């Protein structure tokens, strides 16, 4: 009933205020997915909010058949929303088509062909890029994502590297990655860390029966190695006791995780407390 009331009130809004109209539809769809927590097989649902792109929100299906995970940033709410609100999305697409030049101008300047890598979903630079929030719901489709898909761009100008280029250059650590997952788990939707399933990143570790992902290091037999990273400022419990506050982040392997817990990332003081 509340959703119908919102849609009725939204119809009286001016068509130029597309950001607020998309906000209601996207948040309602994401809320349904997260509350049910049983999305269809091989579906990746994500809410993408970017003030630089006119506040457009995208709800997209999974990337089960794509070798390189990408995000469609074309006009409208995407195929997932179109299947639920076909009339509303068609009307909004017509209204947004008249504003296509102003809405898509920042993306066209960057030379994009209308598709954007997966790292654009993550608020790795909230102040610089204008990202105000994101909510991700991982399913079995996320197991096929490569580690390079979660790496943000590094460098400026001609030295700017993305995806696999970052991994090949050894630039696996990023300044904003610790804040990135902290904001992800404390987003505008109040998404708890429990909803973020472990995302396998290293296939060699998967062969040994271990997952390394957003939540840290997990064992398929249900045993934790004592180095589990949480998505919030809670203290991390390790073999030596309380190590200190940490934030969940993707890691290439267990050795990098242990080394970072002992010595800290580049530019940060050590977080290991001896004794």
Swiss-Prot record:
Which stretches does UniProt call biased (Basic and acidic residues)? 88-111
Q: Where is this region: Disordered?
A: 88-120
User: What GO biological process, any one, is recorded here?
Assistant: symbiont entry into host cell
Q: Which UniProt keywords apply?
A: DNA integration, DNA recombination, Viral genome integration, Virus entry into host cell
Its biological purpose is as follows: Integrase-recombinase proteins are responsible for catalyzing strand exchange between DNA molecules and play an important role in the DNA replication.
Q: Which family does it belong to?
A: Belongs to the 'phage' integrase family.
Identification of the protein by name:
Integrase homolog
User: Which species is this UniProt entry from?
Assistant: Frog virus 3 (isolate Goorha) (FV-3)
Gene behind this protein: INT
């Amino acid at each position: 009933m509340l959703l119908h009331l919102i849609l009725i009130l939204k119809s009286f809004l001016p068509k130029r205020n597309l950001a607020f109209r998309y906000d209601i539809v996207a948040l309602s769809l994401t809320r349904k997915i997260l509350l049910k927590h049983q999305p269809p097989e091989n579906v990746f649902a994500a809410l993408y909010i970017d003030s630089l792109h006119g506040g457009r929100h995208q709800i997209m299906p999974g990337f089960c058949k794509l070798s390189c995970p990408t995000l469609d940033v074309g006009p409208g709410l995407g195929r997932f929303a179109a299947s639920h609100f076909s009339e509303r999305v068609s009307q909004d697409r017509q209204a947004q088509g008249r504003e296509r030049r102003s809405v898509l101008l920042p993306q066209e300047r960057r030379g994009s062909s209308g598709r954007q890598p997966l790292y654009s979903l993550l608020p790795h630079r909230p102040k610089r890029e204008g990202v105000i929030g994101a909510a991700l719901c991982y399913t079995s489709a996320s197991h096929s994502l490569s580690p390079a898909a979660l790496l943000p761009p590094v460098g400026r100008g001609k030295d700017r590297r993305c995806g696999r280029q970052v991994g090949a250059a050894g630039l696996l650590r990023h300044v904003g990655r610790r804040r990135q997952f902290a904001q992800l788990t404390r987003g505008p939707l109040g998404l708890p860390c429990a909803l973020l399933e472990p995302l396998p990143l290293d296939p060699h570790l998967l062969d040994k029966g271990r997952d390394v992902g957003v939540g840290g290091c997990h064992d398929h037999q249900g045993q934790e190695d004592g180095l589990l990273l949480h998505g919030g400022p809670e203290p991390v419990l390790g073999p030596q006791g309380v190590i200190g506050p940490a934030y969940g982040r993707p890691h290439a392997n267990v050795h990098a995780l242990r080394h970072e817990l002992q010595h800290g990332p580049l530019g940060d003081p050590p977080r290991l407390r001896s004794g």
